[in-house]
Structure formats: structure tokens, C-alpha cells
């Protein structure tokens, strides 16, 4: 078999559907051609390779490149002062209603140029890449005007031009009510549906549309309108749902065949059943749970029992999860949410790919998929979840290089 590169003498965690658990292959080989995997499996079953380069992994573990399926990586400014206020007793809702929160970041984002947004996001992206990230989802949602939302999405896309990483973008215009629409949330949703989404779609700047369905965000009826507008433009949807209360957002997301519903601390049985039936992935965000000192756990066992796919993400954002470590996210998910090692690792590979609609292309070590790899100096995969402040990444491969 002709190929560009071969990684031999490796232990693989393939996450392939046909293998149990995380798909372990003890004596494994991965081969790539033109950026795609052409073989991933046991050395004893591998064809004869004609390779330009063969790399001896010396028994190291190879997983798919890590995927962060929920971030707000592009934003202006900083919210460290709000962190101090929260430590002094202020709640997320109190800070938001006092003009802080998302709106304060909106002002800084509007004031920044596209280039400035790219420059400020790069250190955050680099921190994730340093831990084996190869694909990231990035939302807009801090511009909250047509021009500034477009600027934010362009900045997110531009990150893929300056780093070897795949970026998927999500339009989150329905994130918060901008000051110019104070007292008129329906008027703002009109703007999102009739001006913003058509413009975003026309420029091809978004791979999906998201909304914040919450008491301090937008109602279920308003979210439905956003989803209908997205559907008319052929864009899949995602939803911030049931984080602070239960507005039946997850069930609404499932009704529209959403890729994912995210947060879910207040999710109920009806929402779980709807997600399971629709095949909507649950994206769990332990960093936000930790940072805002939430006490209500997402219903992990009920989601697990219903067969809802479980993905994990950093939720990197300036206000409620300034987290740029997927490895720490793994430990938080295991420690706080009682997820298993296998669930955690699948949550940042296979299930994360599912959550962004890219499972046909990334997320597992299988022939035909992008050759995105993370190569680790570990004895067993559990060490990626168990250790904190520990980065055993040996090498990262993106599209075969």
C-alpha cells in the first residue's frame, strides 16, 4: 500500500464503532496518504506499506486529535473584575442584569478590529493546541450587531489561516440583548432572523446556528424563531439549554434535529427522551460548572441510560469558563460529573466530532478520516484523565503532518 507516513509500534485508542470501549489496539499502526488515514489497526493485519517516512512510536499511545466542540474563543477584553465580584458574593444573573456579563464583553469586542480579535484569541488557541487539539468549534455572540458578528466570525475563520488547526464556526447572535434593543427582545430577534442569519449564510461564515435559551437570554418562542430562520438557510442548530433553569430548550433543540444541546444542569426526563430520539448530543461543560460554583449536576446517569451521546468541551469564554485546557476538562468531568475514563476520552474525540457534525471526517482512527493524531507519553489512557497540570503530549499530527 502506497502512503506518505506510517506510525508504527504504537498503542492505539481508535474509538472505532466496531471495537469495544475506546477501541484499544496494543500493537498498532497508522498510515496516511494525502492527509487521510488509509490504515489504522493491528500491525499483524496491516498491508505491506510503501511509505515516504516511517516513525517508530516506541510503544506510545495514539488517539485521535482532540476536539473542543463548544468555545467562545474570539472576544475582546477581560472579565477578571467580575471574577472578583463573584467571589464577593454576586451571582451570574446579578452581574448580567447590572450591565456586566456578556454585554461588557460586547463593548470590548465591538471596539476591537478583526486583527485585534485574532491576536487576542491566538494565545488561547495555542494553549489548546499544545495539549493535542486539532479541531475547535468557535462561536460568535459578543458582537451582537450585524457588522460585529460578521467580524467575529471572520476572525474565527482567520485563526485557521495562521495555525494548523481545523475551525468550525457557529453564529450565536441570540446570545444576549444588546443595549440598543433594551426592552425590545422581539425586535432584536427580528434583526437576528431577517438580517443577521441571511448575511451570515450569504458569506458562508457559519457551520451552525446557536442561541441562549434562558431567563436572562431568550425565550423558547424566540429561540424557535431563530431555529426556523436557520433551517430556511440550510444551517444546522445547537443550543445553550437548561443551564440556569428549565425552559424546555433541549426538547426544542431536539425538535429541530439539533447537533447538540449544551450545559444541561437543569435538564429533565422529557428533554432527555427528546434528545435520545433525535440523536442530539449532550455537550457537558464542567469548567463552567466549576467556575460559577454550580451545585446542580447534569443528569449524567439518566443521559447515559437513555443512550444520549456525551461530549465534553472547555466552554472557553471570558465570564464563566476562562478555561483553555481540554486535559483539565477531562479530570473535571470525571471528578465532578462522575463520568468514566472511556466516556471522558470519547467526549473529546468521537462524541465531540458528532456534536459538531463532523463524525464522518474526524474523531476516530479509521480509514478515510482526516489523519489528525495526538501521540502521548503515557502508560495507559486513564492518565490523561487522572493527572492535573500534566501535559504528556509527545507529538500532534494535523492532516497527516
Curated annotation (Swiss-Prot):
Name this polypeptide is given: Imidazolonepropionase
GO molecular function: imidazolonepropionase activity; iron ion binding; zinc ion binding
Gene Ontology biological-process annotations: L-histidine catabolic process to glutamate and formamide; L-histidine catabolic process to glutamate and formate
Catalytically driven reaction(s): 4-imidazolone-5-propanoate + H2O = N-formimidoyl-L-glutamate
Pathway named in the protein's UniProt entry: Amino-acid degradation; L-histidine degradation into L-glutamate; N-formimidoyl-L-glutamate from L-histidine: step 3/3
Originating species: Caulobacter sp. (strain K31)
Cofactor(s), names only, from the UniProt record: Zn(2+); Fe(3+)
Residues annotated to bind N-formimidoyl-L-glutamate: 142, 317, 319
Keywords: Cytoplasm, Histidine metabolism, Hydrolase, Iron, Metal-binding, Zinc
